Amino acid sequence: YLIFPSCASRVLAADETGVSSSEYLVKIAQNAGVPVKILDKYSSHCCGMAFDSRGHQKIGTEMNIDLMNFLNDKSELGAIPIVIDMSPCTQFMNQRKSDLTLIDSTEFLNRIQNKLEFEPNDESIFVHPVCSSQKMGRTTDLIEISKRCSTSVETSLEPFCCGTGGDRSLRYPELPKNAFNQSHPDLKSQKGISSSRTCEMGLTESCGIKFSSIESLVYHSIKK
């Protein structure tokens, strides 16, 4: 497996340790005995979603094509699966037809979970499958792997949008606060888990509990 660190995960560390989601993925894979490698020169590339979603489709498409060509070369024309550490980026990239095998980190963690020895705790966690996970039909990946980490997992009965919308919550912080309060006015969990760094930041600011990455949760829940 090859790992492509998303722009948001590169810039915005997954937790207070400063360890990124991709770095956690490497540590987890090593624990499982699964060979992985973070792509060289990944910092020169972006999937283009940040530009496309702001209306700059031309530059977004150009960056996406450039990244796809880069990944095609590094993966030996699609022979090596590529893991992406942020669900919105995975979903955006999979919209473009290619010979690449692009895997979301939640799917990757589910693939290797039986190679890991979990030490679940009883800390209650709220698990939020982001919109892109819902669109990919992969919401159960996040929930199932979270249940290996905690004996008390809470999630929404119905899928909902947290209102973060990429960087929109940075400009309009009232969006995630309003979206979450309407969906879960009586949240009792001690911490939150998701698979998008920007959503984690927006939810942390809006709902009163800290949201972290699924990679961080898994790493801190396995026997070292």
Task: Give the ranges of each region predicted by the language model.
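Iron-sulfur cluster-binding electron-transfer modules in prokaryotic oxidoreductases
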Residues: 1-224
